[in-house]
Amino acid sequence: KLVMLQKEYPDNELFGTYKSEVRALRAMYYYYLLDMFARVPIVESSTIEIKDVRQSKRSEVFAFVRKELEESLPDLSDAKSAAEGEYYGRMTQSVANYILAKLALNAEIYTDDDWTDAVKPDGKNIKFTVDGEEVNCWEATVKYCNRITASGYALTQGLNGFSANFAAKNEGSIENIFVIPMDPTLYKANMMYLTRSRH
C-alpha cells in the first residue's frame, strides 16, 4: 500500500517516515513471533503465493528483525509515543531501541537454530554496532537502554510505582515507551483491544 501511495503522491515528504514506522512496527510483530514461536515464515510481499512461503530459521528471523529496526531507526521521530500529540501511539526511536534492547538481551537464544544440542552461542561473540561502535550483545543491551533513559524515560518511584503502570489511567507514567491509544472518546475502536491477552 505504501508503494502505491508513493506513486500517487511522489512529492510527499513524509513517505520515508511512514515507511520506517511501518517497517519498525512489522519488526515488532516479528519480534513477538520470534520470541513465542522461533521459526516462522518471513513474508515481505503482499503478492507472494502461499506455496512459496517457507519457514525461516530462528536466526534468520532474528537477523530480519534486527535489520528492519536498525535501518528504520534514523527515520523515526525522537518524540515520545506516550505523549499526546502527533506521535501519540506511533512507532518512535525509543520504541525501536526498546525492541533492539530486548533482541540483544536474548540474542544467545534467538541465534541458536538447534536448541536440542546443548550447545548455545556465546553472547560475547554476537556483535551489534551501536553509535558507530561494535559491541557484544550484552553491551548493546546497555547502550540501547541508555538511549531510552536519555530520551526521558525512567522507572516509576515509590511504593505504588510498579503497580501504577497497570492502572486503567496510566497515561502519565514515565515508563510508558509504546502505547496503544485507548481513550473512550478519541479512540473508541481501540477500547476493544484485549489488554491482557498476551500474558
Language-model-derived ranges and their functions:
Residues 1-37, 49-86:
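Conserved, well-structured interaction surfaces
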Residues 37-43:
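Short, flexible active-site-proximal loops enriched in glycine and acidic residues
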Residues 44-48:
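Outer-membrane beta-barrel translocator domains and adjoining extracellular loop/strand segments
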